[in-house]
């Protein structure tokens, strides 16, 4: 399966039990910041934004004072899982980023999608990739 198929079929799909509800944008990005696959709506990000995200995975709490920035949008960092998941909130939407061995699985949402639904979609694919040694 291509990386684009993972984004299209597993991240940008309808959320179980909520037909028509889906993430606003999604991507799979290498630890080096290279985009493996993304939705057409995923924001173009700066290398320093991805560097900050990677630093927070290695040094949890790094982004808390400044916020998580992606594509010029600032998200307030909320409780995640140190070294594994970063979650951010902005208004009625937010972001979930799951770290795997080689990649970051990113999902961005807006209402009516809930934070928990975004977490479920992103973390399910991230856990699967971890199981596959990715």
From Swiss-Prot:
The record's annotation in SUPFAM superfamilies points to: Profilin (actin-binding protein)
Q: Which domain of life is it from?
A: Eukaryota
Decide whether keyword Phosphoprotein is in the record.
Answer: yes
Per UniProt, the keywords (alphabetical) are: Actin-binding, Allergen, Cytoplasm, Cytoskeleton, Disulfide bond, Phosphoprotein
Annotated Pfam families: Profilin
Q: List every position bearing Phosphothreonine.
A: 114
Keyword Calcium listed: no
Q: Where, per UniProt, does this protein localize?
A: Cytoplasm, Cytoskeleton
Q: Post-translational modification, briefly? A: Phosphorylated by MAP kinases.
Q: Name one GO molecular function term.
A: actin monomer binding
Extract the coiled-coil ranges from the record: none
Q: Where is this motif: Involved in PIP2 interaction?
A: 84-100
Can you name a GO cellular component term? cytoskeleton
Disulphide-bridged cysteine pairs: 13-118
The family annotation for this protein states: Belongs to the profilin family.
According to its UniProt entry, the function of this protein is described as: Binds to actin and affects the structure of the cytoskeleton. At high concentrations, profilin prevents the polymerization of actin, whereas it enhances it at low concentrations.
Oligomeric form and interacting partners: Occurs in many kinds of cells as a complex with monomeric actin in a 1:1 ratio.
Q: Give additional notes from the record.
A: The variability of the residues taking part of IgE-binding epitopes might be responsible of the difference in cross-reactivity among olive pollen cultivars, and between distantly related pollen species, leading to a variable range of allergy reactions among atopic patients.
Q: What is this protein called?
A: Profilin-2
**What is the source species?**
Olea europaea
């Amino acid at each position: 399966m291509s990386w684009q198929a993972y984004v299209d079929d597993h991240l940008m799909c309808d959320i179980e039990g909520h037909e028509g509800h889906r993430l606003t944008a999604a991507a799979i990005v290498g630890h080096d910041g290279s985009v493996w696959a993304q939705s057409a709506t995923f924001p173009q990000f700066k290398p320093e934004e991805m560097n900050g995200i990677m630093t927070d995975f290695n040094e949890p709490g790094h982004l808390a004072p400044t916020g998580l920035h992606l594509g010029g949008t600032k998200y307030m960092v909320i409780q995640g899982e140190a070294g594994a998941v970063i979650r951010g909130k902005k208004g009625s939407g937010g972001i979930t980023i799951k770290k795997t061995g080689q990649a970051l699985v990113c999902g961005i949402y807006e209402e009516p999608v809930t934070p928990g639904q975004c977490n479920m979609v992103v973390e399910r694919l991230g856990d699967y990739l971890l199981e596959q040694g990715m």
